[in-house]
From Swiss-Prot:
Residues that, per the record, bind substrate: 55, 163, 189-190
Function of the molecule: Catalyzes the reduction of Delta(1)-pyrroline-2-carboxylate (Pyr2C) to L-proline, using NADPH as the electron donor. May be involved in a degradation pathway that converts trans-3-hydroxy-L-proline (t3LHyp) to L-proline.
Active site per database record: 50 (charge relay system), 51 (proton donor), 191 (charge relay system)
Entries under Pfam families matching the protein: Ldh_2
Catalytic activity of the protein: L-proline + NAD(+) = 1-pyrroline-2-carboxylate + NADH + H(+); L-proline + NADP(+) = 1-pyrroline-2-carboxylate + NADPH + H(+)
Signal peptide annotation: none
Protein name stated in the entry: Delta(1)-pyrroline-2-carboxylate reductase 1
Binding sites annotated in the UniProt record for NADP(+): 123-127, 181-183, 232-233, 307-313
Family: Belongs to the LDH2/MDH2 oxidoreductase family.
Tree of life domain: Bacteria
Keywords from the UniProt entry: NADP, Oxidoreductase
E.C. designation(s): 1.5.1.49
PANTHER family: MALATE DEHYDROGENASE, OXIDOREDUCTASE-RELATED
Annotated organism of origin: Burkholderia ambifaria (strain ATCC BAA-244 / DSM 16087 / CCUG 44356 / LMG 19182 / AMMD)
Length: 340
């Protein structure tokens, strides 16, 4: 570790160790702490600051609110030959994902397509680590979930939707997968929280205030409603996530999750839907040809100077592996108070 007046530089091992210390010190089981520390380290490594070590503050706050069970043991049920459900029992979601992933992969490789529902989980993390884990098995992955009702539908002013992210990963023959992970809101909730914490203005298309007017004040945005991206198109996708990641799998919508919170301010509790496809089953002897089609499309994008989604993350990943990560000292000091 090195330190300046403004920043602290940590290796990835030091980030992981810090996360483990904070989580176990605050009552998290070793299994949950390991699963969460892995993903927080990945977020910080890829310079996804709203999903890196900042999330330790969110995790501990939720634990202290008494909603999350830090010792919950996920249970798994096979609903059919290609559908698995994992009950998180009001624990954080990441251990449930790790519990169900091997079964999801097995089912997808047997049938060509499989789905996993994660129920009754508290969820704070990005989805790209999950779909990247699916792509690492040679599979195509999709994941989505509702959250708390922070987002107004296009043309409305009252929150109905969550930030409702959708993530997708496509395995590539060489190198990193093609990945995207984006909220159907104009921006992730955590980014507005970070702007408020740092006293920075936000773009007016991110949110509206309590009177329904566009705002550049992040604190007013947090008291008002976030906006969807892409107008009515973003609203439609957000509704789809509510249906697939909530109603379809027997779990709460974002409005129900907000009501369940009872004003405590914990991490959202809801469900998550994960789908995996096996290109080998779909394509058979044409597998290489199918993947080659994808590669030609990617080349047609990058060949004209455009970037593929997540390229910034992958560039950051290489930097962090080589040089460590930089964390604002004020944030680092705040995280250390969680060890008091």
């Amino acid at each position: 570790m090195s330190e300046s007046l403004a920043e602290v530089v940590l290796s990835l091992d030091e980030v992981h160790a810090l996360a483990l210390r904070v989580l176990t010190h605050n009552g998290m089981s070793a299994a949950h702490a390991q699963a969460i520390a892995n993903v927080i380290t990945q977020g910080q490594r890829d310079e996804c600051h709203s999903h890196g070590v900042y999330r330790l503050l969110v995790c501990v706050r939720s634990l202290k609110k008494g909603k999350v069970d830090p010792q919950a043991v996920p249970t798994l049920r096979r609903l059919s030959s290609s559908i698995v459900a994992v009950d998180a029992h009001r624990g954080f979601s990441l251990l449930s994902f790790e519990t169900g992933l091997p079964v999801l992969v097995e089912m997808a490789k047997q049938h060509g397509i499989a789905a996993m529902a994660i129920n009754h989980c508290y969820h704070f993390s990005a989805l790209w680590p999950e779909v990247e884990a699916i792509a690492a098995e040679g599979l195509v992955g999709i994941a989505m979930n509702p959250s708390h009702s922070w987002v107004a539908p296009e043309g409305g002013r009252e929150p109905v939707f969550g930030t409702n992210p959708i993530a997708f990963a496509w395995p590539r023959p060489d190198g990193v997968p093609f990945v995207f992970d984006f909220a159907t809101s104009a921006i992730a909730r955590g980014d507005i929280e970070l702007h408020a914490k740092q006293g920075k203005a936000i773009p007016p298309h991110w949110a509206i205030d309590a009177d329904g007017q566009p705002t550049t004040d992040p604190k007013a945005a947090l008291q008002g409603a976030m906006r969807t991206f892409g107008g009515h198109k973003g609203s439609a996708l957000a509704a789809m996530v509510e249906l697939l990641g909530g109603a379809l799998i027997g779990d709460m919508t974002s409005r129900e999750s907000m009501a369940f919170d009872e004003g405590v301010g914990a991490t959202p509790c809801h469900g998550e839907l994960v789908i995996a496809f096996d290109p080998k089953v779909f394509l058979g002897d044409e597998l290489d040809a199918g993947l080659a089609r994808g590669e030609r499309m990617f080349a047609s994008i990058t060949g004209q100077g455009a970037r593929l989604p997540s390229q910034r993350r992958f560039d950051a990943r290489a930097r962090s592996i080589a040089h460590g990560v930089r964390i604002p000292k004020a944030l680092y000091d705040e995280i250390l108070t969680l060890l008091d």
